A protein has these predicted regions:
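STAS-typified acidic loop motif
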Residues: 23-35
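Single conserved hydrophobic/aromatic residue that forms the stacking wall/gate
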Residues: 1-16
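Short linear Ser/Thr-Pro motifs
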Residues: 6, 28, 62, 116-117, ...
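Conserved polar catalytic motif of the HATPase_c/GHKL fold
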Residues: 63-67
């Protein structure tokens, strides 16, 4: 008989083993964007993703972290928090990128392709569009003066090869 089940812990243990989380906090420096991407990719490896799935997730994270640096903190120093959650049973990867920067006044407008708050920096305004394209779900929560939280999900192993 199972060790955990014999102690009445079978279901509790299974539920606990279903999830794995990782949280990173780093400064809003350009060099940390690649650190965030690579850290998330290494964590995602537990789900045995394809090369394409890893590339998609890394691209979406890169866009979210860059948005926090450029738009959230207006290139000033600040903290970015990235939390990754794996549902090992359903093979779902979720990442939350959060800043405490200036926030977004109109999220709906900000998510329109080609919209940017920094045209002088030659920003393309495609960050949210890329996040939507590479992930299955995207949710953006923001409030001016409080910062922005970007939550993205991707099911691993269900997307056809290109």
């Amino acid at each position: 008989r199972d060790y955990y089940a014999s102690r009445g812990l079978g279901d509790v243990y299974k539920r606990q083993m279903r999830w794995n989380t990782m949280t990173l906090e780093f400064e809003s420096r350009p060099c940390n964007e690649s650190f965030a991407r690579v850290s998330a990719a290494a964590f995602l490896a537990q789900l045995n993703p394809t090369v394409e799935e890893v590339a998609d997730v890394k691209t979406a994270i890169s866009e979210a972290v860059t948005n926090a640096m450029i738009h959230g903190y207006r290139q000033e120093k600040g903290k970015i928090q990235m939390k990754c959650v794996l549902d090992l049973e359903e093979k779902v990867f979720q990442v939350t990128v959060k800043d405490t920067g200036v926030g977004i006044e109109n999220v709906e407008k900000a998510m329109e392709p080609m919209f940017t708050t920094c045209p002088e920096l030659e920003r393309s305004g495609m960050g949210f569009s890329f996040m939507e394209a590479f992930m299955d779900e995207l949710e953006v929560r923001s409030h001016p003066g409080w910062g922005t939280e970007v939550v993205m999900k991707r099911k691993i192993g269900v997307h056809p090869e290109m």
